[in-house]
């Protein structure tokens, strides 16, 4: 699943700008348990799109990107359990591309992650496995 982290601004009745962090989940891949797999065929089945919105109070100075993804992991596990009676395990394989800062201060970002200011997206690959 590819995730794009985007900062969106919404105005309320008092014209005060609130900041929301929206994560667009483009796809979730589920392994297909059958053999053999044809040459060039993807061994995964793609799921439908999801969207997660984090309120501004969920992203603080002490919240790192890794902690935000941990919350997203929990959300997805719960959503998948509600969707089907089977038990799912969400295994994360992270492929970090360029990163968008959560705010003008870079202190919110885990410094271990690579950052390229020209591109503004974070790509993370998830694999959902049946148990």
Swiss-Prot record:
Segments passing through the bilayer: none
Effect upon mutating residue 32 to G: In strain: XH1549
Domain of life: Eukaryota
Effect in UniProt of substituting residue 6 to Q: In strain: AS2.101, AS2.1406, AS2.179, AS2.7, AS2.724, AS2.771, AS2.820 and AS2.93
Outcome when changing residue 19 to Q: In strain: XH1549
Outcome when changing residue 22 to S: In strain: XH1549
Note from the entry: Open reading frame that exhibits genomic organization compatible with a translational readthrough-dependent mode of expression. The sequence can give a readthrough frequency of 9% when cloned in a plasmid with reporter genes. When the initial stop codon is bypassed, translation will go on to the second stop codon 321 bp downstream.
Protein name per its UniProtKB record: Bypass of stop codon protein 4
Provenance organism: Saccharomyces cerevisiae (strain ATCC 204508 / S288c)
């Amino acid at each position: 699943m590819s995730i794009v982290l985007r900062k969106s601004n919404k105005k309320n009745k008092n014209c005060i700008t609130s900041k929301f962090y929206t994560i667009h989940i483009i796809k979730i891949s589920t392994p297909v348990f059958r053999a053999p797999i044809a040459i060039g065929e993807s061994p995964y089945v793609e799921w439908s799109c999801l969207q997660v919105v984090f309120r501004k109070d969920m992203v603080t100075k002490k919240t790192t990107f890794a902690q935000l993804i941990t919350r997203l992991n929990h959300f997805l596990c719960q959503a998948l359990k509600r969707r089907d009676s089977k038990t799912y395990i969400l295994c994360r394989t992270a492929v970090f591309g360029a990163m968008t800062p959560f705010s003008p201060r870079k202190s919110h970002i885990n410094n271990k992650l690579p950052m390229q200011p020209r591109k503004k997206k974070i790509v993370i690959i998830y694999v959902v496995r049946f148990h």
